[in-house]
Regions:
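Short, acidic/polar
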Residues: 63-80, 163-183, 237-250, 294-298, ...
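Substrate-binding surface in catalytic domains of secreted glycosidases
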Residues: 97-119, 197-347
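Extracellular low-complexity, Gly/Ser/Thr-rich intrinsically disordered linkers
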Residues: 64, 350-417
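Conserved, mostly hydrophobic/aromatic
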Residues: 86, 149, 192, 219, ...
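Secretory targeting and sorting signals
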Residues: 1-42
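Active-site groove signature of glycoside hydrolases
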Residues: 174-206, 264
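Generic structural signal for well-ordered alpha-helices
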Residues: 132-136, 171-178, 209-220, 248, ...
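Glycan-recognition patch characteristic of GH18 chitinases/ENGases
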Residues: 49-180
Length: 417
């Protein structure tokens, strides 16, 4: 799932913007005529709406290979018109430092005119090519679009343990990499995807409950207020689970927002089932694990004192599925993961919408039974339900994993409001 130049003006903090707008509007209204009052009220309403309007999409560095998904696809699909932020994933974390992931894809790959965002081919002697140059071109078309470099992810989170031993040195390395003069002005901040602090992911971390806030505090101190600092965090709201393992509330003061990963609750790593939706919004009768759903995650994080405006609603632009299933409804047994294009047990929405159309809904998301395969995924209709929940809860916006899973015309992202 990140020679120094002058700082860029960072987006005004949401809460500060809203409060100032409302306060200013109230003062002006006292002596304003009807037209002025209406304009001020409209401005205040727009500011309040913007508080929950972030749309953050992950772009995967490796997607330019087998998936053949490039930065140009963000533009051609219409997704760039909906996005407020892109998380470029992933940079590596190794040796206690932030590091490049795939340097060739990021900075060296030459793009033809046909594959370039602006229709201009790369030349052999230009200093920057690859995804970074394409992102820069995308920002030129969409000046309000912000790009964050995301570090870690499932595969590269093992390096955070060493990084946590010297947070200041880690933060310095991240800043130096994100702000490298070769790709100056591509990135507007950093996103940390540590899976998981003081808990188990691909490997088990024992850095302690305070390691995460110390790391995020060091990043904020180094990047300052002119850059975005965000983090993808666990959605495990169970008692004694991953949310409890780290001090996410203590770190909230340092981040612009959190991306709670409210997907992958269930999947074919439990090969025999029971089948269950991987991104349920709410609980339902027969759910395999209590508090494994989005509303439990948000309730727990808010209960810890984390402001709703700093929590984004997570969506998956893909499905998870089993095979060897006879029962149409959730809760059936299986024999293993269903076949997927790139990995068994997982498939893009753009494939599933036609290969295995939804046959029902449960817990605010969709499921489908096709032959002996059983899949769960979100559709434009279930995303609309989740948007109503997002707005009701006063959340800061929406994020999703990841852009290449959507249709060529951006069917899912266009359902986000």
């Amino acid at each position: 799932m990140h020679v120094p130049h002058l700082p860029r003006v960072r987006p005004i903090r949401t809460l500060f913007s809203v409060l100032c707008t409302v306060a200013l509007g109230a003062g002006l209204l006292a002596g304003a005529g009807p037209a002025t009052a209406t304009a001020a009220q409209a401005e205040a309403s727009a500011a309040q709406a913007a508080a929950g309007s972030k749309v953050v999409g992950y772009f995967t560095e490796w997607g330019v290979y087998d998936r053949n998904y490039h930065v140009k696809n963000i533009e051609s699909s219409g997704s760039a018109d909906k996005l407020t932020h892109i998380n470029y994933s992933f940079g590596n974390v190794t040796g206690g430092k932030c590091a490049m992931g795939d340097a060739y894809a990021a900075t060296d790959r030459a793009y033809t005119a046909a594959d370039s965002v602006d229709g201009v081919a790369d030349t052999w002697d230009q200093p920057l090519r690859g995804n970074f140059n394409q992102l820069l071109k995308l920002k030129q078309k969409h000046p309000d679009l912000k790009i964050l470099w995301s570090f870690g992810g499932w595969t590269w989170s093992g390096g955070f343990a060493q990084a946590a031993q010297n947070p200041e040195a880690f933060a310095q390395s991240c800043y130096d990499l994100v702000e490298n003069s070769k790709w100056a002005d591509v990135f507007d901040g950093i996103d940390i995807d540590w899976e998981y602090p003081n808990a188990c992911g691909l490997s088990c971390d024992t850095s302690g409950r305070d390691a995460f806030p110390k790391l995020m505090g060091a990043l904020r101190a180094k990047f300052g207020q002119d850059y975005l600092v965000t983090a993808a965090i666990t959605a495990d709201a169970t008692a004694g689970g991953k949310i409890d393992a780290a001090d996410y509330a203590g770190a909230a003061q340092y981040v612009d927002w959190y991306n709670p990963m409210t997907y992958d609750f269930f999947g074919a790593w439990d090969a025999t089932g029971p089948t269950a939706p991987h991104s349920p919004l709410t609980s339902y009768s027969g759910i395999p694990k209590e508090d494994f759903h989005t509303s439990a995650t948000i309730a727990k994080l808010k209960g810890l004192g984390i402001p709703a405006s700093k929590l984004l609603l997570g969506l998956g632009f893909y499905g998870r599925g089993w095979t060897g299933v006879t029962q149409s409804e959730p809760g059936g047994t299986a024999t293993g993961p269903a076949k997927g294009t790139y990995e068994n047990g997982i498939e893009d929405y753009k494939v599933l919408k036609t290969s295995c159309p939804a046959t029902g809904t449960v817990g605010g998301t969709a499921y489908a039974k096709c032959g002996s395969d059983w899949w769960s995924y979100d559709t434009p209709q279930t995303i609309a339900t989740k948007m109503a929940y997002k707005n009701e809860q006063g959340l800061g916006g929406t994020f999703f994993w990841e852009l290449s899973g959507d249709t060529a015309n951006g069917e899912l992202i266009k359902a986000i409001d």
